[in-house]
């Protein structure tokens, strides 16, 4: 828990950055943008943030306007009043005043602290009182402060003599604040905003080593500070957050640690080791004791004991008590158990889910109080807070090396000093003798984002597949290098040949195709060399000794080939059937890549995108392992009994199971797995890395079944297909289990035991099945144990005839079949089917004739908009910025400058969470009949996702025209894709805001202008400056007139209306 005065100091610093105060509703965001943490008001004993702010009047002054909005202002104190006075005195000429008046981004705030450090140095006796410095500022407007200030780009001013020493306040700022990674992706880069200080040469060279400050204490020199930091890290050998080192330093030595020192820690390898841990767009830094210990240093035991004696005498009783409590509740065994759980969730685990997983795994209760203070686990995992609720955090496991060190893992290999020195000497000699070794070639940089394509050039082992990256950044560079090598060695035929080849040497090789390749010598055998051309193609070739030549021309070009591993195929890498399948599917093909793990040998999923449908190569190769004896071989005109229907789709197709040897074998294997898992900790088999095509286990109705992951919607929700029943559902990642390794081969070799089929003898113009017919079929064939069927045609799906199993075979007549009965029911319903419209006070619903509306135009709504959803069932309208204000938005749809849809950027996280909950609920819920009415709210399934929609019209043949309320899109969907919208999904305001671009004249926009506008703004985060709000009775019908600003380009703000006007002028000139 943070100290109250520490939080108050940080809060005062946040409030000082805004001249006009900060609204209470934005205070948490501003606090976190500066410190990287939320205001822990609940930990401090307050129910609300306003109550906490009201309890510290010496720090915060509260103002409440006529509308009831609360604004917080900083209260001046002796530590900061002189800064405010000095700033006001220079407000007309000094651009530094912008740092005190405006709400700053993180990087500028840190630069302000550097300015205050410089001012503190000026009062040192060693400095002249007439010190001047020049400040050059490149000011970039922030999204929520896009205003123009008229000031000079540089000015010179003098620090006044009367300015007393400013005592700097240290508060925990996460090291991430100094990284560009903290700035959100939608916010522009301010990296070019720099300060340049030019100090006069008035330094007193005879100044003493340490100087006095206003408090009378002596400031230690650099050597003493470094020794103190070493002492702190020797006690905390499990690591200390860089953001916490200043606090621990102050509590231990009763002195503040300068921010300049914090910035220099990364450049002091003899003092500490800094490890960077990335999670998403954020980067954290952890300090560890220096790995290189000088020979003169005492042993580890003596050093630890000495450092503990030094620090324990200076640590306060409060800190000591808290550390004892932490050690009592967070033992090494407990933390190791937490690590074992988090390792299975590399994409992160919600903190509130940890207690249940812990109890399931270890049959012990999760310690109380840990969730309220997740920093106790910070040495083994990264805690990412997503709201002001402490439990609403995501935990990420740290790297293995970091975790082992944090858990005091001492079982490490000790290398004797003599052997180590000999090895280092040999390594240095080899580098001097062969400077062109492979280590001199730059490593291949794996693309960090965007689509990645590779060329598969060697498939000898799926665990070491040889690929070459293709694309403009790779293929072009490779071809250019080959051309240069060919030109160089062709002109320099006398280039020195290898006289004494050595293993590991990098050489150039002339191939039969008149090309020159880079290679490394891997063996020398009786005047013949074995080379590995892995700098380019990774193939092992043998040449005569005189053939290779020294490669000094292209050593600095990075390799374009790399080894990779195909996930899911590791266990079967030695199977010849699998190797043949991999070669058939991938060899010498350009494939798309999904990178699951970035390591020395990255883990991939390959996709063949050359056809109409993308083929998952990993999943396809597994099918080569199927045991042919377990496959279902159906014969035409053959009667099969004891058939079970397992799934019926909305288009009338179905999946069936037949008694077979494969089904019996599958049941036997799943029973053995069930018995095995009963005696194991099931959490050990949690799916840690889900990907499309992965085969897992899912507990359905008390029995384990095989499922294949088909869609990954989010970190929690997945779309799966039941391999042996044909059902499709959405499940949570935590509900899936890995197949135990000892049963993996048995499970994979059994082919799917469900066959896809359809009914025979249906009229050719049946068309789309009506919902009533599908429901009738499900009621009559699902959950019945036995049927008889006869195969009529064998295609990609079987065309079947069905009979009830209890009918004797002698009575299997055509008129008694399910086919004929469903046929009659289908046409009976098509004659009088209607879509009901239930609105109070409305006329009876219109009937359909043969599935068609009375109106001839199928695109015209069958029912006009009459009546709207009651106000109590509609969520509150989305709060917007005031006229003239700025807000971050995301443009989801862009038709033309006169109509586009924006979403508030800060609410996108909440919307994604809502969509995830809807997917999980509706995919598992039973379908219910729905009374459709216009202007009513529903949940609709569109492209495998569930959305909140309002029905705009009812079309013929069971189609609906709907408007997606959170994305602003119009869609036409089938009526069977609609379900009631629950109350819990109506709380979040609808996110789509209709908008019109300000600054341009309203007109009939041409297709060319619309396309240019759409390509410029659609699917992009921008800044909106609202000029007008046109209210409406329905929240989804109101419209805003706004400017749009693109701030993604450093140092440049692109106003979209200027871009549109310029584009229109160019189009006019072209005409």
UniProtKB/Swiss-Prot annotation:
Gene3D superfamilies: 2.30.30.140, 2.40.50.90, LOTUS domain-like. Residues 295-318 are annotated as: Disordered. It comes from the Eukaryota. Highly expressed in the developing lens. InterPro entries: LOTUS-like, OST-HTH/LOTUS_dom, SNase_OB-fold_sf, TDRD7_LOTUS_3, Tudor, Tudor_domain_containing, Tudor_TDRD7_rpt2, Tudor_TDRD7_rpt3. GO terms for cellular component: P granule; ribonucleoprotein granule. Keywords: Cytoplasm, Differentiation, Repeat, RNA-binding, Spermatogenesis. PROSITE patterns: HTH_OST, TUDOR. CDD domains: LOTUS_2_TDRD7, LOTUS_3_TDRD7, Tudor_TDRD7_rpt2, Tudor_TDRD7_rpt3. Residues 3-76, 221-289, 330-399 form the HTH OST-type domain. Its main location: cytoplasm. Residues 298-314 have a biased composition (Polar residues). Belongs to the TDRD7 family. Component of specific cytoplasmic RNA granules involved in post-transcriptional regulation of specific genes: probably acts by binding to specific mRNAs and regulating their translation. Required for lens transparency during lens development, by regulating translation of specific genes in the developing lens. Also required during spermatogenesis. This is Tudor domain-containing protein 7. It comes from Gallus gallus (Chicken).
